[in-house]
A protein has these predicted regions:
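Histidine/acidic-residue-rich, glycine-tolerant segments that coordinate divalent metal ions
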Residues: 37-49, 53-125
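Metal-associated gating/positioning segment near the N- to mid-region
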Residues: 1-54
Length: 125
């Protein structure tokens, strides 16, 4: 289940605790949190913090990594380091990767690690 728990940074909307209890009440046992938090989930430290705080929640909380640093579509995150930190996939959720070469490189890196990459491609025009 794709979720936006908004933790860290936007916990006035939702957080790990309230989101996990709501998911459990709805019968969901596992959720995948998106990376559009503050800070963005684009470093191993951020992902490790989230997963550590999720350890004692009533459901399984998984975390995706951003594809690009800062969701800027210019520099890829360190895919291997993010997987090692616990990422279950990659996405710049809600922000299209407009450079085809950059997107292709991201897909190659994700495939080499046998990890999914989820794209939200659209022309904002």
């Amino acid at each position: 289940m794709h979720v936006h728990f908004r933790d860290p940074g936007f916990t006035y909307k939702e957080d790990l605790e309230t989101g996990s209890h709501a998911a459990a009440a709805g019968g969901f046992t596992t959720v995948v949190c998106m990376a559009n938090t503050k800070p963005i989930v684009d470093t191993p430290e951020v992902i490790q913090d989230i997963l550590k705080r999720a350890e004692n929640l009533p459901i399984h909380v998984k975390q995706v990594s951003a594809v690009s640093k800062g969701f800027e579509g210019k520099e890829l995150v360190d895919f291997q380091a993010m997987v090692d930190a616990g990422a279950c996939g990659f996405t710049d959720d809600g922000i299209p990767l407009l450079n085809a070469t950059f997107c292709y490189e991201a897909m190659q890196k994700a495939a080499a690690l046998h990890m999914p990459i989820s794209l939200h491609e659209e022309d904002k025009a």
